[in-house]
């Protein structure tokens, strides 16, 4: 792929996402989402491998189905209300269809079937883009419609996403697929308070992106693709490996790390609205994900994988490629809990 393509594709992805978040018209938002989808396909299929081609095909078909449903819902609402504004979505059937379409775009259960396979077929940094940046545009629309979406639907999908994210990641050995199930579980936490407190949902999404990004950057810089490779990451950068351990625990929501902040705020808000049963169920189901993160921590920092004495020891990363950005994000992903009372 030539230089012009690599300049055009990231620019299209960035601008289309920004335009969706600032759009007030359904046709404009739908068009930008389509541009965003079409820009991602060359990035996914870039390795020129059958698995990458399969991932790009699955991504295209799923996103196209979601876009068709989204356009159908917007048209149905326009026929009823004679308006195309996003904030004037009032038809109940259109709201339900729009919710389903947006859930499919972000990979929430039970529409999560495509996300692990696409993440595994793409490269590490492309998978990072799918699991973080590509969620911004649909989430922005969901936050705009948060006061119109049925709370029962959101809570049902939230609990189902947390459960499926935990169960799906239990038997995984591939890091990208495991992080995809982690994304599904965190999507459930984001959806849980979207109708109650959209600002907490936005905070949860921000902290998830801030925590996931350095993990993927470390996987990319150390060429780690499986859990077995994670056990030898210390030979490349012992310091960053120790910080990575704390970042993984933060992703699991273990106090006193940053990842505990959104879960604390979400459960507190749900208890305030007398949703004790749902809050308890979410907390119990999140233990499945926490077990996965503890297993990663144990493998990366608390044990040494079997290896022969002639194993090549890299000892240090090349300082020219030292991921300083990931180091900064790791620190933020670990130490931001004390600012919670200020939020």
Q: Where is each model-derived feature located?
A:
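Core, highly hydrophobic multi-pass alpha-helical transmembrane subunits of bioenergetic inner membranes
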Residues: 1-343
């Amino acid at each position: 792929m030539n230089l012009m393509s690599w300049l055009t594709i990231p620019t299209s992805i960035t601008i289309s996402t920004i335009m969706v978040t600032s759009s007030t018209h359904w046709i404009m938002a739908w068009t930008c989402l389509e541009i965003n989808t079409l820009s991602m396909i060359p990035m996914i299929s870039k390795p020129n491998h059958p698995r990458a081609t399969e991932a790009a095909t699955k991504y295209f078909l799923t996103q196209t189905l979601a876009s068709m449903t989204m356009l159908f819902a917007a048209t149905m609402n326009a026929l009823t209300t004679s308006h195309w504004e996003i904030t004037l979505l009032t038809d109940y059937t259109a709201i339900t269809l729009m919710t389903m379409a947006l859930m499919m775009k972000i990979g929430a259960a039970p529409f999560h079937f495509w996300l692990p396979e696409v993440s595994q077929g793409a490269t590490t940094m492309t998978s990072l883009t799918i699991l973080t940046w590509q969620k911004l545009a649909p989430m922005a629309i969901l936050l705009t419609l948060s006061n119109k979406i049925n709370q029962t639907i959101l809570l049902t999908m939230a609990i189902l996403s947390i459960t499926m994210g935990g169960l799906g990641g239990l038997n995984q050995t591939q890091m990208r697929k495991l992080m995809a199930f982690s994304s599904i579980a965190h999507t459930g936490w984001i959806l849980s308070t979207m109708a109650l407190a959209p600002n907490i949902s936005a905070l949860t999404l921000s902290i998830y992106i801030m925590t996931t990004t350095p993990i993927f950057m470390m996987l990319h810089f150390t060429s780690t693709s499986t859990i077995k490779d994670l056990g030898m990451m210390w030979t490349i950068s012992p310091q960053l490996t120790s910080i990575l351990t704390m970042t993984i625990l933060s992703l699991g929501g273990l106090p006193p790390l940053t990842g505990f902040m959104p879960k604390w705020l979400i459960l507190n808000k749900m208890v305030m609205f007398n949703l004790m049963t749902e809050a308890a169920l979410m907390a119990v189901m999140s233990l499945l994900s926490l077990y996965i993160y503890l297993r990663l921590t144990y493998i990366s920092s608390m044990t040494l994988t079997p290896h022969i004495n002639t194993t090549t020891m890299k000892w240090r990363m090349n300082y020219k490629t030292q991921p300083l950005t990931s180091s900064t994000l790791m620190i933020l992903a670990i130490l931001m809990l004390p600012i919670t009372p200020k939020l």
